[in-house]
Amino acid sequence: MAASAVAVAFVVAVAAVLAAAASAAVTYDRKAVVVNGQRRILISGSIHYPRSTPEMWPDLIEKAKDGGLDVVQTYVFWNGHEPSPGQYYFEGRYDLVHFIKLVKQAGLYVNLRIGPYVCAEWNFGGFPVWLKYVPGISFRTDNEPFKAEMQKFTTKIVEMMKSEGLFEWQGGPIILSQIENEFGPLEWDQGEPAKAYASWAANMAVALNTSVPWIMCKEDDAPDPIINTCNGFYCDWFSPNKPHKPTMWTEAWTAWYTGFGIPVPHRPVEDLAYGVAKFIQKGGSFVNYYMYHGGTNFGRTAGGPFIATSYDYDAPIDEYGLLREPKWGHLKQLHKAIKLCEPALVAGDPIVTSLGNAQKSSVFRSSTGACAAFLENKDKVSYARVAFNGMHYDLPPWSISILPDCKTTVFNTARVGSQISQMKMEWAGGFAWQSYNEEINSFGEDPLTTVGLLEQINVTRDNTDYLWYTTYVDVAQDEQFLSNGENLKLTVMSAGHALHIFINGQLKGTVYGSVDDPKLTYTGNVKLWAGSNTISCLSIAVGLPNVGEHFETWNAGILGPVTLDGLNEGRRDLTWQKWTYQVGLKGESMSLHSLSGSSTVEWGEPVQKQPLTWYKAFFNAPDGDEPLALDMSSMGKGQIWINGQGIGRYWPGYKASGNCGTCDYRGEYDETKCQTNCGDSSQRWYHVPRSWLSPTGNLLVIFEEWGGDPTGISMVKRSIGSVCADVSEWQPSMKNWHTKDYEKAKVHLQCDNGQKITEIKFASFGTPQGSCGSYTEGGCHAHKSYDIFWKNCVGQERCGVSVVPEIFGGDPCPGTMKRAVVEAICG
């Protein structure tokens, strides 16, 4: 070959490589994120890898894909990966690379939210506590020590992703990355130092050359080329800060977190779907559900303070990895409908037309003839019939219908056709307990004694929830209270979060803060004797705060004053006398939660209702493959370990306050709107990953602070107990799209884990009333309803019945819109 030909061939080859690289690059324009040269409507869901086990990851990711997701979004948890300076950990639940590779294997993309501040109701917002003690540090502002550590960790993660070939241009799944997190409110408060920090963070991130777009959420002045994005229950109001950026929603909140002492939040899927459809209707092109699977705050990872161990979040995939229906199924249908509209959605902006006082249409068209319409009724009470394109459409209140061809309704946000699954927690075994009493006033070889009160985290460095504060009070023989029988009054003021007061070795009182206010004050009558008295206060942290500014200033523990009233002298201030400090429990120092540590002490017969007690039991793994949990309803407050691994904090003794009332999907949602568990424990059941168990000889260890009844603890299996469906004659269907006509609606029921339908508890075709678990017949009822469902469904794992009068022996009430409603038992 001639030299010139070789040169030409080389140039062509290089051009081909460059062209391939260019086509693989991820960019964006004003309409959407552009992947491989194509504008994309991207549906994403948050799954946080440390909140589930590696054994759960493949199934969670597959269920996310089956639910219609394109992207899995996760934070990167700095304190899990760098527990001490320069010492990195990327194994087990923190194997980030393995998690991302599993997402790639499933054919999904990744939005990697490096932060490295994450909030996330995670301990200390994801920051390692050692960061607080870097000299001269001030968090999340224009501070050189903080910026140096942040840049070092961010660079570490980016270089790791590059070395593993995980960015999209390398053939990996990462198409987006996030720097910082929800910084806008802090920037507003701090002013210029915060603005300088935000600009620095953006420039630092871009300089890492990831070749994928960077985003900042809740950061209105994110500098180019960073995309600012929205977080919230609704984001149809949001527009990016520059016209050349796409409209993105990084956190569509599927509900809210659970905290100890507050009701459990739920968000109706009708409202969630409505919020997402409103955002897409506005021109949004990226939606991420926060959370799609919430998981579990294992060990001491929960933040808050007072964040519960469960991070279920009422997500489409529940804490245990099971589908939450109808939320998962209804959103899956929404995603299908949106994807049918994609060619029109990415082509241009909507044309919005009023169809009534609270009704409108948003129509998207492409130059190739694609047309998609969203018909909205934002009235919170009334149904509406609207005229559009020469046809009439019935819209439930607070809903949107999606027409991928501007004619055929395939989905309405308020018409839920997916089944409703009611879960059961089935007893799977009890335990034979032994107990060991935690020693009070048991100091180590070299206890810390100093004048005055010390802040708790400065002493413990968050290596334990527990810190003992002990001081001594001398009482003279001539004190009047000794002879007149009166009590002294002890007052202890603490920054939080919980406190047990012991006088001469006896528990005298317990006090704790709340999600809204972690600070607390103990005031109680105490009996002292002549001579030396011991006052011991066990201060307990319940997760470090995860949101706010100036993390370096946050504190916990007894800061004072501590006073004693009723002495001859009046009030004695104990704040500035000598205090002795013991970090952690004696049982912790002996590793009683482990097999080796638990064998070093003598365990006795179990005691009940005794504070500061360790319990242990051995058990075999229950048969089957259903997810497992511990029912802790008989206990007060403490921590759980299985085979040495931390299940988390438990606190069923903290009852949820408030009045839960009824729930209606219509109208704006907030975290107080649809709640359960008022007057009950915020969390009763605690997830036990099956992968943590051996077939036999598993060690369960519990530390109980308050005093509970361990004989009431049981292992339970989580599975579907019953399934319900409520389907209208005119339920929109994806089949309508294929036939361009309105297909017959159909009821679908399905049990799980090999279960079959064993009984039809209720069935009615007509106008039934009530909700799943409490249905009743209405004024219109087809008498063959029960027989039809029994014949088609009993003995089957899944079944389907068409919602048409002839199936049920004729029309029981002509001219009336009818529904087929059924409840079936799985077993």
UniProtKB/Swiss-Prot annotation:
Residues 1-24 form the signal peptide. The keyword Glycoprotein applies. Keywords: Apoplast, Glycoprotein, Glycosidase, Hydrolase, Secreted, Signal. PROSITE patterns: GLYCOSYL_HYDROL_F35 (PS01182), SUEL_LECTIN (PS50228). GO terms for biological process: galactose catabolic process; plant-type cell wall modification. Glycans are attached at N209, N458. GO terms for cellular component: apoplast; plant-type cell wall; vacuole. Its EC number is 3.2.1.23. One of its GO terms (molecular function) is carbohydrate binding. SUPFAM superfamilies: (Trans)glycosidases, Galactose-binding domain-like. InterPro entries: BetaGal_gal-bd (IPR048913), Galactose-bd-like_sf (IPR008979), GHD (IPR041392), Gly_Hdrlase_35_cat (IPR031330), Glyco_hydro_35_CS (IPR019801), Glycoside_Hdrlase_35 (IPR001944), Glycoside_hydrolase_SF (IPR017853), Lectin_gal-bd_dom (IPR000922). It is found in: Secreted, Extracellular space, Apoplast. CDD domains: Gal_Rha_Lectin_BGal (cd22842). Pfam families: BetaGal_gal-bd, GHD, Glyco_hydro_35, SUEL_Lectin. Residues 741-827 form the SUEL-type lectin domain. It catalyses: Hydrolysis of terminal non-reducing beta-D-galactose residues in beta-D-galactosides. The active site is at E182, E251. Belongs to the glycosyl hydrolase 35 family. This is Beta-galactosidase 2.
